[in-house]
């Protein structure tokens, strides 16, 4: 029913966040709740699961992560809580690569995943995550193209107290700047951050 929520993160716990969307607080279970900052505006991709016990919202930072969650749910023996626990225990790229390579032993290290369930995950999903892995690899390559001076500047801005999200918002603009040193990038970055 919901595709995504865009709102202010008001509560962060180890298992869920609360997102205020136009005055309504939605409790959203997330594999990575601490990736969000309290008070920040966030776009969270939502999967609504309806069961006899109630309606539960699960939220993800990207459509790809939501897609991986849905793929895990399609595996016999994996419910929403198990899928969320698996995604919380490992970064999505490593998880998808392990499934694509048929690494049953690797998958058994996740909470609630025994050898039988791990084998079922590989059986059901192997070959279905190639596009996902390729997209993540492309994203990693694009992020790896940042110059050492720009990378130092981004780390310095975080050390100055700016959040990762704030720094991420200006990274593309800083990549377009013709600068040779980290100091030049920092000055431009501060100007962009103070403009908000």
From Swiss-Prot:
N-terminal signal peptide: none
GO CC annotation, single: Holliday junction helicase complex
Region of interest (Domain III), residue spans: 149-196
Assembly with partners or alone: Homotetramer. Forms an RuvA(8)-RuvB(12)-Holliday junction (HJ) complex. HJ DNA is sandwiched between 2 RuvA tetramers; dsDNA enters through RuvA and exits via RuvB. An RuvB hexamer assembles on each DNA strand where it exits the tetramer. Each RuvB hexamer is contacted by two RuvA subunits (via domain III) on 2 adjacent RuvB subunits; this complex drives branch migration. In the full resolvosome a probable DNA-RuvA(4)-RuvB(12)-RuvC(2) complex forms which resolves the HJ.
Free-text note regarding domains: Has three domains with a flexible linker between the domains II and III and assumes an 'L' shape. Domain III is highly mobile and contacts RuvB.
Family annotation (HAMAP family): DNA_HJ_migration_RuvA
Protein name in the entry: Holliday junction branch migration complex subunit RuvA
Organism expressing this protein natively: Lactobacillus helveticus (strain DPC 4571)
Gene: ruvA
